[in-house]
Amino acid sequence: MNHSVIIPPLKRIAVMGTCVPRQCGIATFTNDLQQALKNSDPDLCSTTIALTDDANTYAYPPDVALEIQQATPASYAVAADFLNVSNVDLVSIQHEFGIFGGEAGEYILVLLRGLNAPIVTTPHTVLATPNAAQRRVMDGIIEHSSRLVVMADKGRRILQDVYDVPTEHIAVIPHGVPDRAFIDPAMAKHKLGLADRTLLMTFGLLGPGKGIETAIRAVPALVRDHPNLPYMIVGATHPNPIRDEGERYRDSLVALADELGVSENIRFVHRYLPLAALLAPAAACHLHRHSAVPGT
């Protein structure tokens, strides 16, 4: 880990990650982080470096200074050179294995090795049992980062116990929530046609590894005691499985609900909901099942 770098007073920050309007949880996080930085210090110059999947083009906001074509190794070297000549004081990287190119997202190492500025990395997935490629990439990220930021104490423990990261090089900053006006839960449930029912909900982009199948398999036991229990699964399928196999994953979830005889209790909302549209169903639910990888 890069222990020797002293981070100077910050005047110029670059934030790297996927970026809206790309439909990705990291993109939303990057957007929220940028907004928080701007609100914290009007004099701070904060720009975004956006990771773009090669199959799509996006109408990015003006603060996106550069795009990295995530499947092109040379694009990462270009980004490092761009940031070096931009004289940024800090690079904040949002890391998820799947948004960087190469095996286990190894192209990020091209960027890290070329950067001059201090690096603060937020790993959005902290794997307790990485495979060899994931371990190699994570070790490289740790080596080049001045600080690692995780959103849960479990992530800190994994970094310490599995990756031998010293405590003083880890910051735990809990994930924020939107500051919004109060929405009456009873009214929200009424609008969804679920008045007087206890609502279980999962939202976010769907894909293997988030345990949705496990939740669906639990529904038969739940409805024995709560026959009118609705389980709402909100979100479009993640673009990566869509690219590789179309809607096979979502179809498998629907088939599983049919097989278990609980299709009447499970409601799929098959679209990506922006924050404003998500607030009402979130207010209506009694129990939210979080679907992120443990340790994030």
Spans of features found by a protein language model:
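Acidic donor-binding loop of glycosyltransferase active sites
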Residues: 146, 265, 280-296
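A short helix/loop element that forms part of the nucleotide-sugar donor recognition site in Leloir-type
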Residues: 182-194, 199
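Short N-terminal targeting/anchoring amphipathic segment
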Residues: 66-68, 80-105, 118-122
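Carbohydrate-associated surface elements
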Residues: 154, 176, 237
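Conserved donor-binding/catalytic core segment of Leloir-type glycosyltransferases
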Residues: 15, 194-210, 216-219, 232
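A conserved, positively charged/aromatic
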Residues: 113, 127-146
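N-terminal strand-loop element at the rim of the active site
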Residues: 21-23, 34-87, 237-239
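Nucleotide-activated donor-binding/catalytic signature segment of Leloir-type glycosyltransferases, i.e.
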Residues: 235, 244-272, 276
